[in-house]
Amino acid sequence: MPIHNLNHVNMFLQVIASGSISSAARILRKSHTAVSSAVSNLEIDLCVELVRRDGYKVEPTEQALRLIPYMRSLLNYQQLIGDIAFNLNKGPRNLRVLLDTAIPPSFCDTVSSVLLDDFNMVSLIRTSPADSLATIKQDNAEIDIAITIDEELKISRFNQCVLGYTKAFVVAHPQHPLCNASLHSIASLANYRQISLGSRSGQHSNLLRPVSDKVLFVENFDDMLRLVEAGVGWGIAPHYFVEERLRNGTLAVLSELYEPGGIDTKVYCYYNTALESERSFLRFLESARQRLRELGRQRFDDAPAWQPSIVETAQRRSGPKALAYRQRAAPE
């Protein structure tokens, strides 16, 4: 009675745990038909009836209850054998990791050190957020992990998860007309020239598509901020690029009224599906999430050293929203 596909065992156990095929399909992100067929095929392999169907509900048979502990052990052995095989073959494997330039350098150092605990070689590749996803889709890129602020729901060969958040700011030269405008949201900036990251492919995801119709594209954040400091337009940049300039007064924050403390930006991890079953990779994900949380707390503690107060920010603006901020922030 050979079991032809261990994925069928995993799906069957999920059906029993959730109580229905529909629930298991949602959890596993599979179609109802795929999960139902997996259970049926497993019954054929084992020559026993495993479930009783009662409408939408599914209950295990007595034979299934006796087999379930062995099935769980089988999956545990599969994981163990996979880990052993991975370690035997690890050798000089070169894990290629792409990190876009919106990710803080201190986080990149953490990524490298954590991965080197389990992989002999790690190559870190830095690229613009506007090009990150296009890069991992190239067949010759051979990227294993990509950490980026850009988002795409489905990419062949890759799974996606969220590691945490980083901060970004909308900035302009202190003498830019926007510094005296009433800004209710980022949409208020649409009529002014934006300095934005350009994609080599000429296409942008919805997340990174420019807000303004008047756009000047550049290749990197350094070029963006040089033009912003020259008064050419406004831009959106990661916190670690702009905080020194904010302290020096060469840039002003435009997003403080509607996003105090910076704009929360999700950090996504796209990883080759082959890594999903490796415990070392799961440990890396947890370490990466923890490091992002630590960086966020550290920024919060350091923020008062440079961040303007609500009163100071509001006094640089005009209009009803600025007046409301002044009234709320005024001392008793």
Curated annotation (Swiss-Prot):
Record has tRNA processing as a keyword: no
Family: Belongs to the LysR transcriptional regulatory family.
GO cellular component: a single term: extracellular region
Description of how activity is regulated: Both 3,4-dihydroxy-2-heptylquinoline (PQS) and its precursor 4-hydroxy-2-heptylquinoline (HHQ) function as ligands and promote MvfR DNA-binding activity leading to transcriptional activation.
Localization terms from the record: Cell inner membrane; Secreted
Bridged cysteine pairs (disulfide): none
GO molecular function: DNA binding; DNA-binding transcription factor activity
Pfam families: HTH_1 (PF00126), LysR_substrate (PF03466)
DNA-binding region, residue intervals: 21-40
Gene Ontology terms describing biological process: regulation of DNA-templated transcription; regulation of transmembrane transport
Subunit description: Forms homooligomers.
UniProt gene name: mvfR
All residue ranges annotated as the HTH lysR-type domain in the record: 4-61
Principal cellular location given in the protein's record: membrane
Origin organism lineage: Bacteria, Pseudomonadati, Pseudomonadota, Gammaproteobacteria, Pseudomonadales
Role noted for this protein: Transcription regulator that plays a critical role in virulence by positively regulating the expression of multiple quorum sensing (QS)-regulated virulence factors, genes involved in protein secretion, translation, response to oxidative stress and the phnAB operon. At the stationary phase, negatively autoregulates its function through cleavage and translocation to the extracellular space.
Annotated protein name in UniProt: Multiple virulence factor regulator MvfR
Keyword line: Cell inner membrane, Cell membrane, DNA-binding, Membrane, Secreted, Transcription, Transcription regulation, Virulence
